């Protein structure tokens, strides 16, 4: 849509599709702006209400991201911006008492740093790798700003028989997210 020496803006247009009846409603425009020498990406989602105000009501509106991940499960991280900093988790958290994972490995992981574990030459690394095989894999996260003064973050494992569990509540989330793995972050 716009291209210059300092920024570029991409414009995507489409229509939401109702899951209930495949009805096409709410035309939308998404603009992504990328800036020179900046890690910031602006994301603007605009929708046009084209329904019948007497029978069509909005329960919620959201944006869903799917990101293919690479590398070890314990090196996959997600971070949401919150009103008091950030909510950060690993897809596989190496907090285990049996087998006991070395505290320095867990501390490195919780700082969002990549772990380079060599099971052949390091017993602590071998223990962490073995423990990771028995940990839940938190692969689905939801950030929901459900009112002007409340948001929640929930997480879930892949198993369809399992429900989401609460991760965090707060007042306002800026809507920022960082998803990282061994190949980089988004």
Question: Model-flagged regions — what are they?
Answer:
Residues 1-186:
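Beta-strand/loop-rich accessory regions of lumenal/periplasmic or secreted enzymes
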